[in-house]
């Protein structure tokens, strides 16, 4: 029975967080991977300026003593013990110590002999290679020079030379490998053959083969040489290609290996030619009988001057048993992309060939010389795949990029970048110029990396152990939570367990390791629904010590008022390995077992879920069926297909019906956290919602909570009222985006776009200050040709129209136009009302000139528009000049004669009209339009002298001219009129002659005398007597009554 859960001592949450922060602050958590940059082995040149580190190699010495050595070439180092030579170059062997200056010079017993050879500046150490564990060492000097015919006619041949030394770096005369001359070039030929071959520019070992590159052979076409030993047999091979041109530099770099283009027992030579056709190439050469290397394939570069092929490396990147090829092009560039240097990765096609195009192209930053060095460094993280190092020595102080591989080949992104400037080494520059790996020098089962430079420094980077975390279990109990069963101290219990092993598989690696972990409840939701009992928050920080501790258990509590009970609560865990690393560089070979790193290929997090108990079927999964219908309504709550908008439009309604009913495709179960989201335009402002409190507005977003849950077969109708506040002339429609959402399962909820088309109705008004004017005609007839001024035409008229603004500026969308149906002439073609000028007043004044030259067509001189005074012999026949002008005035002529009047309009056919248009300005102010005209006096005298009054009518219309179909305006029309009266001429009485007066008086007196005489004759002047008067009175007094006519008639019968 296994051990039970182990509980850690309780500690306050703040203390645990403080500890985590303290560990992180005091130590450095490895952000890269497992090449250590704090515990370094650094070696410096004995003689500065010697290019110590130009070439490097890791070597394991097993003869005479057991030790690992760092080999460094210094091709510009000073000569030793030779009076004829200043510089020869050297190779140094450096032990793994904390000292920088304890390297020893390798003994190469080559003495100067100017008559036979020159070793001055021969660049000894340009190439350094180790044969591997218990193997030999190869050292080359590619500028070693042979002297022919010394004296005045001496000739020199820079053929180069390589030296092989034993495992202890000493010369063993009994070893054929070391005593063989290794001079593959014939110094008796000139540069067109092998007289300038520069053997040793590159070279290396296999178990039974030593190989060299000679890029100067054959006029610098170059060549590659290989010496193979099998038992007691020795075979020499060289490439005799058909290339005739020079300057290819074949052999600039060389690698030899098996399982490249042939099975494991056949060798393939891979050699670079960085100047092939100016773009570089890599030759793959097959070993043939007779000592020839036969060309099998050529991989060509893609950019002129990139130096493709100047560095190559072989490694089985995908573990398919075949070696893959990496080729450097350090001077590759892409100006726009800021790229400088490239590495081409060619994946082996199971021994058949390599593809012509790279499977992967890695780039470095501009001017970095990325790819000038490439090395297969072994499996530094022990994940089962080979890793690669690429140098970029001119990026800052130099960088080394570490790439891991997988079953798919090399990974595109580097797993670690070592920065030269961050190593803290004074004087270090061009870090990464040379590389050597594939050897575990501190014997921790992880291969290490030696990095050289041109600044007289070499640096050993050792690999730290990699830890695999096992059994990263995180279990929550119960998995289905019933809130009713929670207590005050526990609701959910979480158990986490860890174990580890070393990636290299060392069973004895049992270091005490403490993981720092973080648990977070409901990480993707705020506010969280669970909290840890110990930290009183949704986050808990803790530590886990291994291998002693196996598991820990933590209690969680449920928050109050949890709404979301549909989605599970995710409890996430992540962990790290905080280590206390030194802040400063520590030199020496200190063990790195105490500083492991976590395997970055593993996920450093885990999670588990806690579900709420729900009534959503046996699978505890709610399958809802929310459906929605929506429509716009008018203010009268009638369906609205288009909005006829005007400034009087205040409200707009949106009706939404939401249902959750079962269907044949969906179960229609409860919809948890059902929500309706509306995205409305800025022209609509939320006013009210029915039912109230359902929706909340946030700028242009409206959120409506439908229910939690919105139950099966539930229906809801929303009536949302908007205030229409921002509709402009540019508004064509009002789009509203409606989106239903729920935390239940429903994958067919798509947004619905509801669009209401808008017709904008402008509101403007047209008014006339005086609809009915009065004027007159009279006088004499004047011909049109005789008229010079407007006063010659007749009496003046003045109409003043007023237009109120439309509110929104029309700008380029349209124009308001005032049109006049103007009574221009009578039916016989004579002038009627002669327009003299039209003026528009709004933020200034300007004339209106309708088309057709209809305003003042005779170009008469205009005068003061005031009323023309009457002549002394004329007066207006108006009885009540202060009376109401809107009713027909009563004139003197009408009072006396009441003669008839006539009406002239275009509608009754008695007048002819023309159409005058005046575009009005786009302004927010009131616009006034003044129309001035003259009554054509001659026409009225000639044709209407028999009428006491003539009335002339016209019409004015305000309308909108636009090409936008959604903008309209109701035409505004008003009438205008003028009453034109004829004038009364009063003639004064003439003087009468005196004699006529006297005759008339005399005749009157004679007539009066005759009348008096006649009356006298008739007794008119006689007086009655007194008695007769009295009798008459008495008789009259006695009379009672006179009989009627009827009585008289009856009395006669």
Swiss-Prot record:
This protein's record includes keyword Disulfide bond: yes
FG-GAP repeat residue intervals: 38-103, 110-171, 185-235, 236-293, 294-355, 357-412, 416-478
Glycan-carrying positions: 86, 501, 512, 574, 606, 657, 699, 843, 859, 925, 928, 937, 971
Gene Ontology annotations of biological process type: dendritic spine maintenance; exploration behavior; heart development; integrin-mediated signaling pathway; lung development; maternal process involved in female pregnancy; memory; mesodermal cell differentiation
Gene Ontology annotations for the cellular component aspect, listed alphabetically: anchoring junction; basolateral plasma membrane; excitatory synapse; external side of plasma membrane; filopodium membrane; glutamatergic synapse; growth cone filopodium; integrin alpha3-beta1 complex
Keyword Repeat: yes
SS bond partners: 94-103, 140-162, 185-197, 486-491, 497-551, 616-622, 695-704, 848-906, 913-918
Subunit record text: Heterodimer of an alpha and a beta subunit. The alpha subunit is composed of a heavy and a light chain linked by a disulfide bond. Alpha-3 associates with beta-1. Interacts with HPS5. Interacts with FAP (seprase); the interaction occurs at the cell surface of invadopodia membrane in a collagen-dependent manner.
The protein's role, per its UniProt record: Integrin alpha-3/beta-1 is a receptor for fibronectin, laminin, collagen, epiligrin, thrombospondin and CSPG4. Integrin alpha-3/beta-1 provides a docking site for FAP (seprase) at invadopodia plasma membranes in a collagen-dependent manner and hence may participate in the adhesion, formation of invadopodia and matrix degradation processes, promoting cell invasion. Alpha-3/beta-1 may mediate with LGALS3 the stimulation by CSPG4 of endothelial cells migration.
Record's protein name: Integrin alpha-3
Organism of provenance: Mus musculus (Mouse)
Lineage, opening ranks: Eukaryota, Metazoa, Chordata, Craniata, Vertebrata
């Amino acid at each position: 029975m296994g051990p039970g859960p182990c509980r850690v001592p309780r500690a306050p949450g703040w203390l645990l967080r403080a500890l985590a922060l303290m560990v992180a602050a005091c130590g450095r958590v490895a952000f890269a991977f497992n090449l250590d940059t704090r515990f370094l082995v650094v070696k410096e040149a004995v003689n500065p300026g010697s290019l110590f580190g130009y070439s490097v190699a890791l070597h394991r010495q097993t003869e005479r003593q057991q030790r690992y050595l760092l080999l460094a070439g210094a091709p510009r180092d000073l000569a030793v013990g030779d009076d004829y030579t200043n510089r020869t170059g050297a190779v140094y062997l450096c032990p793994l110590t904390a000292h920088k200056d304890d390297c020893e010079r390798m003994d190469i017993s080559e003495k100067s002999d100017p008559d036979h050879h020159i070793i001055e500046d021969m660049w000894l150490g340009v190439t350094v290679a180790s044969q591997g564990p218990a193997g030999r060492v190869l050292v080359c000097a590619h500028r070693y020079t042979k002297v022919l015919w010394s004296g005045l006619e001496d000739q020199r041949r820079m053929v180069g030379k390589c030296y092989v030394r034993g495992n202890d770096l000493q010369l063993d005369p009994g070893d054929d490998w070391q005593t063989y001359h290794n001079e593959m070039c014939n110094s008796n030929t000139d540069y067109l053959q092998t007289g300038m071959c520069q053997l040793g520019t590159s070279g290396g070992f296999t178990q039974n083969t030593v190989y060299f590159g000679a890029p100067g052979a054959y006029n610098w076409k170059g060549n590659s040489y290989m010496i193979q030993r099998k038992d007691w047999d020795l075979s020499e091979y060289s490439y005799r290609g058909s290339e005739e041109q020079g300057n290819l530099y074949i052999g600039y770099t060389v690698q030899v290996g098996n399982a490249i283009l042939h099975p494991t027992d056949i060798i393939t030579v891979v050699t670079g030619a960085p100047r092939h056709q100016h773009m570089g190439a890599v030759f793959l050469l097959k070993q043939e009988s007779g000592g020839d290397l036969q060309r099998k394939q050529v991989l060509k570069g893609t950019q002129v001057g990139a130096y493709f092929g100047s560095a190559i490396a072989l490694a089985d990147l995908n573990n398919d048993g075949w070696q893959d090829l990496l080729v450097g092009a350090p001077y590759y560039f892409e100006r726009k992309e800021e790229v400088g240097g490239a590495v081409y990765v060619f994946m082996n096609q199971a021994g058949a060939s390599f593809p012509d195009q790279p499977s992967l192209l890695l780039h470095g930053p501009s001017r970095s010389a990325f790819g000038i060095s490439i090395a297969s460094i072994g499996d530094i993280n022990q994940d089962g795949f080979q890793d690669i190092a690429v140098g970029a020595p001119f990026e800052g102080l130099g960088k080394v990029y570490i790439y891991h591989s997988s079953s798919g080949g090399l990974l595109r992104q580097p797993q670690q970048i070592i920065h030269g400037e961050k190593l803290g080494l004074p004087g270090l520059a061009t870090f990464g110029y040379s590389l050597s790996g594939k050897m575990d020098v501190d014997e921790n089962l992880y291969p290490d990396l030696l990095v050289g430079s041109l600044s007289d420094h070499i640096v050993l980077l050792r690999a730290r152990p990699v830890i695999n975390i096992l059994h990263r279990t995180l279990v929550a109990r119960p998995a289905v939570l019933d809130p009713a069963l929670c207590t005050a101290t526990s609701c959910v219990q979480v158990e986490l367990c860890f174990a580890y092993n070393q990636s290299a598989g060392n069973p004895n690696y049992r270091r005490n390791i403490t993981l720092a972990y973080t648990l977070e409840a409901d990480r993707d939701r705020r506010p969280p629904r669970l909290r840890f009992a110990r930290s009183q928050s949704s986050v808990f920080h803790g530590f886990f010590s291994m291998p002693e501790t196996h598991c820990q258990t933590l209690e969680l509590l449920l928050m109050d008022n949890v709404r979301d009970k549909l989605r599970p609560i995710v409890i996430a865990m992540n962990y790290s390995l905080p280590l206390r690393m030194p802040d400063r560089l520590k030199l020496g070979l200190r063990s790195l077992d105490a500083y492991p790193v976590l395997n970055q290929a593993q996920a450093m997090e885990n999670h588990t879920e806690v579900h709420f108990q729900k009534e959503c079927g046996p699978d505890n999964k709610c399958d809802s069926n929310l459906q929605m219908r929506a429509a716009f309504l008018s203010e009268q709550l009638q369906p609205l297909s288009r909005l006829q908008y005007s400034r009087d439009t205040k409200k707009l309604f949106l009706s939404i019906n939401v249902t959750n009913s079962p269907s044949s495709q969906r179960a229609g179960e409860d919809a948890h956290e059902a929500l309706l989201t509306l995205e409305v335009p800025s022209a609509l402002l939320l006013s009210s919602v029915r039912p109230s409190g359902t929706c909340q507005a946030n700028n242009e977003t409206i959120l409506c909570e439908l229910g939690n849950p919105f139950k099966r077969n539930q229906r809801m109708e929303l009536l949302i009222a908007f205030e229409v506040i921002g509709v402009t002339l540019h508004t064509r429609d009002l789009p509203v985006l409606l989106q239903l959402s729920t935390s239940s399962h429903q994958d067919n909820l798509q947004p619905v776009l509801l669009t209401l088309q808008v017709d904008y109705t402008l509101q403007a008004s047209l008014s006339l200050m005086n609809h009915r004017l009065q004027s007159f005609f009279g006088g004499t007839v004047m011909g049109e040709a005789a008229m010079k001024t407007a006063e010659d035409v007749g009496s003046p008229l003045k109409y003043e129209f007023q237009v109120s603004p439309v509110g929104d500026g029309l700008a380029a969308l349209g124009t308001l136009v005032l049109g006049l149906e103007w009574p221009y002439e009578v039916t016989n073609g004579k002038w009627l009302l002669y327009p003299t000028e039209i003026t528009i007043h709004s933020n200034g004044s300007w004339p209106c000139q309708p088309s057709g030259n209809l305003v003042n067509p005779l170009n008469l001189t205009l005068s003061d528009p005031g009323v023309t005074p009457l002549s002394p012999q004329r007066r207006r026949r108006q009885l009540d000049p202060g009376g109401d002008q809107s009713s027909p005035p009563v004139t003197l002529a009408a009072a006396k004669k009441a003669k008839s009047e006539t009406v002239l309009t275009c509608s009754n056919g008695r007048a002819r009209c023309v159409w005058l248009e005046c575009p009005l300005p786009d302004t927010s102010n009131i616009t006034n339009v003044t129309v001035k005209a003259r009554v054509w006096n001659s026409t009225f005298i000639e044709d209407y002298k028999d009428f006491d009054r003539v009335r002339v009518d016209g019409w004015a219309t305000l309308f909108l001219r636009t090409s936008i179909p959604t903008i309209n305006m109701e035409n505004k029309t008003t009438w205008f009129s003028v009453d034109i009266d004829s004038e009364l001429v009063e003639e004064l009485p003439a003087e009468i002659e005196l004699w006529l007066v006297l005759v008339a008086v005399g005749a009157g007196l004679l007539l009066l005398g005759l009348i008096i005489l006649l009356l006298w004759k008739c007794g008119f002047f006689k007086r009655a007597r007194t008695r007769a008067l009295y009798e008459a009175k008495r008789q009259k007094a006695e009379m009672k009554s006179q009989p009627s006519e009827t009585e008289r008639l009856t009395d006669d019968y």
